[in-house]
Regions:
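Nucleotide-sugar donor-binding/catalytic module of glycosyltransferases
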Residues: 1-104
């Protein structure tokens, strides 16, 4: 039986304190046919550095600052993540939250 591919989309903005636990909760899922996509919304803390540490296990993208207006809205960030996702099923996760290992 083929398992559907699941894409977990995470938007991040200045959640340095939580992003490790968030990503690890996705990597530790019992379900293994998944991809994890983290889009950083131009964070000003060390979030992106932490995200990059997982670059061999996740897909990440950093949104460029638009003019001097600061970060873009969360919908735009999730749209970017959705565009590069390849899963048949999409799960959304905020970067200050986590999944239990049997979520997927």
């Amino acid at each position: 039986m083929n398992k559907e591919k699941v894409s977990i989309l995470i938007s991040n903005y200045n959640k340095e304190k939580y992003i490790d636990e968030c990503i690890l909760s996705c990597l530790n899922q019992n379900y293994n046919n998944l991809e994890i996509i983290v889009c950083d919304n131009n964070s000003t803390d060390n979030s992106l550095d932490k995200i990059k540490r997982y670059s061999n296990k996740i897909i990440y993208k950093s949104k460029e600052r638009i003019s001097n207006y600061g970060p873009v809205n969360q919908i735009d960030i999730l749209t970017e993540a959705f565009k590069i996702s390849s899963g048949n099923i999409i799960c959304l996760l905020d970067s200050d939250d986590f999944f239990f290992s049997n979520k997927i």
